[in-house]
Amino acid sequence: MQYKDLRDFISQLEQLGELRRVSTPVSPNLEMTEICDRLLRAGGPAVLFERPAGFRSPEGTYSVPVLANLFGTTHRVALGMGAQSLEDLRDIGRVLSALKEPEPPRGLREAGKLFTLAKSVWDMAPKRVSSPACQEIVWEGNDVDLARLPIQTCWPGDAAPLITWGLVVTKGPHKKRQNLGIYRQQVISRNQVIMRWLAHRGGALDFREHALANPGKPFPIAVALGADPATILGAVTPVPDTLSEYQFAGLLRGSRTALAGCLTPTLSELSVPASAEIVLEGHIQPDPDHPSGYQHALEGPYGDHTGYYNEQDWFPVFTIDRITMRRDPIYHSTYTGKPPDEPAVLGVALNEVFVPLLQKQFPEITDFYLPPEGCSYRMALVRMKKQYAGHAKRVMFGVWSFLRQFMYTKFIVVVDDDVDVRDWKEVIWAITTRVDPARDTVLVENTPIDYLDFASPVSGLGSKMGIDATDKWPGETTREWGRTISMDPAVKAKVDGMMATLFDRPAGT
């Protein structure tokens, strides 16, 4: 699907019956979560809540509608990435693999393809525009008040309203390009949020470099809310370091990404999507009393994609100096909870992008699956064509180290090519018949683990397990290995022809 911005995407979804409007007042405090959870589990449409309830106005409703469940099905994720189906996402993975590690052409034809790909990337370089739509309205001074936006409180035990789909734009002092990341943000005052980014994420790395290079100076940040789907999805896709997320978004969308410079002078190096619905401009301010030298606050607890409330922790405070927006802006939001939720659906879709990337590095991999029940990234199932003893273990460690997205994968199960990794029954059969626990499990201690994983003994540091559920080769066992049972193909073909009439004859005749 080709589209210009979020509004165009919404319009096309509505024409396809993939989006419904709700005019009845619905509260962003818990009610939207429950409605969207039911819609997502039923494979239902995206929803535009036109009159969010609860604002301190005579009507008791916000003037800003809420867009939710936008990526509630893999089909809509595919449409957002410029594809028509989930299967088409493999092609996007192939493009990324070619950009990540291009191979020398073996002839003029391949050279032509490589040139065409390079030209298409070059042609999608983002462009700066003047008078962007995202700056049609500007809030400054006391007008900057997050309470004027219908920010969701998703679960009963949540600490405060939470910004969920904010596209955070940062730039390190030594970086050539900006980083785009999606980090949740707890509202703590009219113009302050807690920026919850994990230590290895791009935004946190940019902030750390800034603090070292410019101690005591505010760190500039812009947050785009309601960016177009390609830009949002580009921020969570394993884009090569040599390619900007904005450029990749242009490839997905089929048109160059229009960017706007921020109005705050100290944010001059940051660019935001010109079509974004709402933009927050501000800084992480210095605090000489904090060990880091910058303002921090205690974040959480919040219900998360694990299905649990996470523990509290300290993160930087983002102070908002200015809010810009389009006329009649739309607030894009989501919730996270026990799978399935939108991150789980995104995980299933992005899984198809990962497969060609992995196969480029490890041609022996024939399929790869991140089951959504495993919180989309904590368990990986790998199907491969095994070629030698120890091969499965090599692949395990390769997957853990190849992409940053698999840094937090706790469990990897490797099976042979005769096992469907997308069928739990087959995976369990392989584990229970081909695994000796002492020989075929690998435990790795003191590895990076998701901070939200309370099962790890130390926050952010824990162990990983690999399970080799492949047939064992000489050197891996001294016993005769079992042969799988299968019917004679000729008999199967004969019975296929018999089944249609075999049970038509009445009993006893």
UniProtKB/Swiss-Prot annotation:
HAMAP family tied to this protein: UbiD
Co-factor binding comment: Binds 1 prenylated FMN per subunit.
Known EC number: 4.1.1.98
Matches recorded under Gene3D superfamilies: Single helix bin, UbiD C-terminal domain-like
Keyword Glycoprotein among record annotations: no
Membrane topology: Peripheral membrane protein
Species this chain originates from: Cupriavidus pinatubonensis (strain JMP 134 / LMG 1197)
Domain of life of the source: Bacteria
PANTHER family named in the record: 3-OCTAPRENYL-4-HYDROXYBENZOATE CARBOXY-LYASE-RELATED, FERULIC ACID DECARBOXYLASE 1
Gene of this entry: ubiD
Annotated protein name in UniProt: 3-octaprenyl-4-hydroxybenzoate carboxy-lyase
One function term, GO molecular function aspect: metal ion binding
Reaction(s) catalysed (UniProt annotation): a 4-hydroxy-3-(all-trans-polyprenyl)benzoate + H(+) = a 2-(all-trans-polyprenyl)phenol + CO2
Pathway: Cofactor biosynthesis; ubiquinone biosynthesis
Sequence similarity: Belongs to the UbiD family.
Cell compartments where the protein resides: Cell membrane
Any one GO biological process: ubiquinone biosynthetic process
SS bond list: none
Record: residues binding prenylated FMN: I182, Y183, R184, R196, W197, L198, R201, G202
Entry keyword set: Cell membrane, Decarboxylase, Flavoprotein, FMN, Lyase, Manganese, Membrane, Metal-binding, Ubiquinone biosynthesis
Entry cofactors: prenylated FMN; Mn(2+)
Subunit structure: Homohexamer.
GO cellular-component term (any): plasma membrane
Residues the entry annotates as binding Mn(2+): N179, E245
Functional summary from the UniProt entry: Catalyzes the decarboxylation of 3-octaprenyl-4-hydroxy benzoate to 2-octaprenylphenol, an intermediate step in ubiquinone biosynthesis.
Active site positions: D304
